[in-house]
Amino acid sequence: MGGGSQVEGERALVQVLVRDNNVDQALKALKKKMQREGVFREMKLRRNFEKPSEKRAREKAEAVRRARKLERKRLEREGF
């Protein structure tokens, strides 16, 4: 088993390498990879149906949040 992920349709197969039968460490690595790839967030969003209007509103709010964060970081870099 490789350490990367392979794309299958829309989902990515997340794989971790178990070394020296250290399952706890492998689980920790798996959880970290899944967190990074947004699997838990996706599961939470898909738990209930989201109306298209709600989805648009959520995505717009996320875009605004991202833009504000980028602006804040840009100003911080420039020393304001």
From Swiss-Prot:
Any one Pfam family match given in the protein's UniProt record, by short name: Ribosomal_S21
Keywords, in A-Z order: Ribonucleoprotein, Ribosomal protein
MF-aspect GO terms: structural constituent of ribosome
GO BP terms, alphabetized: translation
InterPro entries reported in the protein's UniProt record: Ribosomal_bS21 (IPR001911), Ribosomal_bS21_CS (IPR018278), Ribosomal_bS21_sf (IPR038380)
Gene3D superfamilies: Ribosomal protein S8
Cellular component, GO, one term: ribosome
Similarity remark: Belongs to the bacterial ribosomal protein bS21 family.
Protein name: Small ribosomal subunit protein bS21
Lineage: Bacteria, Pseudomonadati, Pseudomonadota, Alphaproteobacteria, Rhodospirillales
